[in-house]
């Protein structure tokens, strides 16, 4: 997938997942439910947002700062899975799958984010087709990226992998 397509998907999500857009699309009752349940959270650099193995309680949308998703590998060494930037949403994959988090999320800088409880996020996906479509695009993009990474790691020699960096 091209970088232009990735940017278009991220921009679509940003247009759909915000107070103004929700107010335009949701019923007044649903909008109030959203507004009353979301929380603004702050984390300092190196704070843990959620732990690997923890039960998801909701999703986080990063408004300011940067974070990382990592998994502890062999001998306790952390492997960074991806970086989280402003506008990104995390926690949804485990929530949608009904499983515990498969990675740790940690603030790389001081961050501010919106936390949306699981029940409200799931409800919004049910009642808001635009949000559902934006999430479907986001998940599909990430699945494609994962497939590309697996192919890259499995089919290329170390020399070929280093040449592409």
Q: What do these predicted regions represent?
A:
Residues 108, 126-165:
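Polybasic "coupling" helices that flank or enter modular domains
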Residues 41-43, 105, 143:
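Short, flexible turn/loop "capping" segments at secondary-structure junctions
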Residues 22, 47-109:
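Cyclic nucleotide-binding regulatory domains
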Residues 121-122:
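A generic structural signal for short hydrophobic patches within well-formed alpha-helices
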Residues 112-113:
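All-alpha effector-binding/dimerization core of bacterial HTH-type transcriptional repressors
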Residues 1-45, 89, 94-95:
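Cyclic nucleotide-binding regulatory module and flanking cytosolic helices
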């Amino acid at each position: 997938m091209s970088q232009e397509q990735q940017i278009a998907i991220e921009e679509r999500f940003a247009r759909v997942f915000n107070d103004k857009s929700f107010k335009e699309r949701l019923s007044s009752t649903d909008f109030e439910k959203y507004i009353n349940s979301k929380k603004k959270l702050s984390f300092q650099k190196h704070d843990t947002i959620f732990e690997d193995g923890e039960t998801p309680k909701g999703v986080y949308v990063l408004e300011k700062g940067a974070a990382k998703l990592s998994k502890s590998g062999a001998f306790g060494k952390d492997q960074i899975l991806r970086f989280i930037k402003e506008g990104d949403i995390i926690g949804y994959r485990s929530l949608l799958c009904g499983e515990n988090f498969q990675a740790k999320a940690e603030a790389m800088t001081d961050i501010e984010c919106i936390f949306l409880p699981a029940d409200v996020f799931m409800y919004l996906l049910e009642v808001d087709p635009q949000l559902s479509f934006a999430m479907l695009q986001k998940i599909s993009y990430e699945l494609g990226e994962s497939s590309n990474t697996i192919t890259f790691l499995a089919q290329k020699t170390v020399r070929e992998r280093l040449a592409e960096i």
